[in-house]
Amino acid sequence: YYNAFTEDLFFWDNDLDNDVDRKLKIQSNNYTTWVLVKQGQEPNISKHFQRYTNDKLTPRFNEQYVVKDKEDRDITIPAYSEVRFSFERGNEEPSEFVKISKGEESCFIWSVFYSLLEQTISVLNVVEKGELETDQFNELEYVFIDDPVSSLDDNHLIELAVNIAELIKSSQSNLKFIITTHNPLFYNVLFNEIGNKACYML
């Protein structure tokens, strides 16, 4: 499912002491670990995020590193537990890490979920069950999406609706999708793209 609870997995460290190293932290969970570590979806997440925001705004996930706590003990920070954002200038000059807007943050979190959804559909589309790369989706019956990225402008919102519709139509399994929204434009585009024989308004 994608809703407000999905966004709660992500929170900001604003580096209040130095105001330099601003980063979005990811709470430890199986969901992002599978997407980022096991499936290597970082490039796809970046691609989706830049599509809906700015092609120069680049997310960078951390590698594992060690820091000292107040008692001088080593603390290991796991890989893919933090992400920093910068604007790429097209040269070798290092870019300052920036804190993105709330709307951009929602787009990033949606991009993580969307990449997982793409991978899930791809896995379930395999006809021969013995050839599945993972069996953790075998019992999955429903995907629930609640008002994805409501802060997008109309053009990007239309693009988002079209992309979701194409992804749903690509599913060859018995997976069912429940999508809720308060946005009439998003609903109309999604409904028209999928076709009224394949979806219902509740």
Language-model features and meaning:
Residues 15, 19-105, 112-142:
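Extended helical coiled-coil dimerization/tether regions that scaffold
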Residues 13-16, 191-192:
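Short coil/turn segments at secondary-structure boundaries
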Residues 97-202:
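Switch/communication elements of ASCE P-loop NTPase nucleotide-binding domains
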Residues 5, 10-14:
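Glycine/alanine-rich phosphate-binding loops at beta-alpha junctions
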Residues 4, 57-59, 199-202:
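Generic preference for hydrophobic/aromatic residues in regular secondary structure cores
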